Amino acid sequence: MASSADKILLGKVALITGGSRGIGRAIAAAYARAGARVFICGRNSTDVENALREIRACGGEIDGVAGDISRAQDVQRIVAAALEHFGAIDVLVNNASVLGPREAIAEYPLDAWEEVIRINLTGLFLITHEVLPAMLARRSGSIINVTSGVGRAGKAKWGAYAVSKAGLEGFTQLLAEEVESAGIRVNAVNPAATRTQMRARAYPAEDPMTLPMPDEVVPIFVHLASDASHEITGQSLNARDWLGKII
């Protein structure tokens, strides 16, 4: 684990959705190294347990549960468990998402469309809506929404995923304006191409060795969770701008 001088998130509690794999898991590990107490959720209980075991083995203070953020009852249970375990939520990272089919709109299946929007956009609303009362009561917090380049400029055959990320960008801006006076920051971060399972599904012919690892894109997430970012809100940022920075 990091030395005490490096623990810029000491005293913070972070809830990370989709925290059991890929970028979410890397953020969870980085936050734990930086001194935060971390709570993760993911749909696969085995993945959640593996992530908890790995991060605890490195000395991190972390807990988590399996759950589906597209289901209101699961969201209530996840947030209640985080608050019961750690007493507060200072940072929310909305990372959970699914890709859906890479099909043109004319051929896009309705059931797939509904699933992607339900998880990526309705899930974003549900978890944020459930966490906000705790942040508003403390008049403090940082919400970080994981976006995508296709949410900023739509691309053919990205379907519901691109639309959901465009919605996330709008959600970030309006929420930032609504809660700024309460001391809560809201920003979006685009990790860009990263060596994850989702990227491999989106680009099966791509050589993953040409891409940065999830650990390499986390510095900006640590910064936005820290008090050093207290003046940053309503922004759509790029993780690549922070590649190589020490955390």
Language model feature labels by segment:
Residues 181, 188-189, 196, 205-247:
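C-terminal helical subdomain
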Residues 128, 164:
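Active-site helix of classical SDR
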Residues 148:
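Residue(s) in the substrate-gating loop at a strand-loop-helix junction
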Residues 13, 20-21, 44:
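Conserved glycine-rich cofactor-binding loop
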Residues 133, 176-181:
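Alpha-helical segment proximal to the catalytic Tyr-Lys
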Residues 45-46, 66-78, 110:
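The beta1-alpha1 cofactor-binding region of Rossmann-like NAD(H)/NADP(H)-dependent oxidoreductases
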Residues 103-105, 109-117:
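Substrate-binding pocket helix/loop in short-chain dehydrogenase/reductase
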